[in-house]
């Protein structure tokens, strides 16, 4: 798939797997994951779950995107996913992208391999 700009849900290209489907949007060193599968919040109802990750493998709480005390947000419609995509562009200051070598480049950056409690964090994008 060629690299493309992602501004709304209908721009996404999903990958199917045994449990459902997933997509990602990369904002420089931040990744927005969008999933719909039998294990995701709302997936059995055809709704989506999103999560945000830094390129070092940390889950990130993002105001207006994830839940305030959780690293994911579930039970989302396509319209709500579009809101999250646009909110991520707004707070990171970059346009989300998908495809090409983006995922390979993102995955090859150093990733922490620690238990989840030790690498979770909340990001204040105003201080970056």
Predicted features and spans:
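Mixed-charge, Lys/Arg-enriched low-complexity segments
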Residues: 2-8, 52-128
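Amphipathic, interaction-prone secondary-structure segments
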Residues: 11-52
